[in-house]
Amino acid sequence: MKVSSHAMVPTHEIIPREEIPLLLEKYNIKLQQLPKLLDTDPLVLEVEAAPGDVLKITRMSPTAGESTYYRLVIATSL
């Protein structure tokens, strides 16, 4: 089963690497300040993201409209 096919799961997409500096500049942050998402997360696996990738997550809300947020994919440490 594809996790992304569930109605409650927001859209996840990988941001092209060349756009990451623009995102960081826009929000005046460093890459490591982004919230993290493990590389073992089912949606990370589904979109084939790798550690170092940034995911753009877009959620629809009946009250807030469209909400976009970003997560940095990190490797799982043992």
Swiss-Prot record:
GO molecular function, one term: DNA-directed RNA polymerase activity
Subcellular location: Cytoplasm
Cystine pairings recorded for this chain: none
Enzyme class: transferase
Segments crossing the lipid bilayer: none
GO cellular component: cytoplasm; DNA-directed RNA polymerase complex
Keywords: Cytoplasm, DNA-directed RNA polymerase, Nucleotidyltransferase, Transcription, Transferase
The EC number(s) this enzyme carries: 2.7.7.6
One GO BP: tRNA transcription by RNA polymerase III
Reactions performed catalytically: RNA(n) + a ribonucleoside 5'-triphosphate = RNA(n+1) + diphosphate
Entries under InterPro entries matching the protein: Arch_Rpo5/euc_Rpb5, RNA_pol_subH/Rpb5_C, RPB5-like_sf
Top-level taxon in the UniProt lineage: Archaea
HAMAP family per the UniProt record, alphabetical: RNApol_Rpo5_RPB5
Summary of subunit composition and partner proteins: Part of the RNA polymerase complex.
Family to which the UniProt record says this protein belongs: Belongs to the archaeal Rpo5/eukaryotic RPB5 RNA polymerase subunit family.
Function: DNA-dependent RNA polymerase (RNAP) catalyzes the transcription of DNA into RNA using the four ribonucleoside triphosphates as substrates.
Protein name: DNA-directed RNA polymerase subunit Rpo5
UniProt source species: Methanococcus maripaludis (strain C7 / ATCC BAA-1331)
Gene responsible for this protein: rpo5
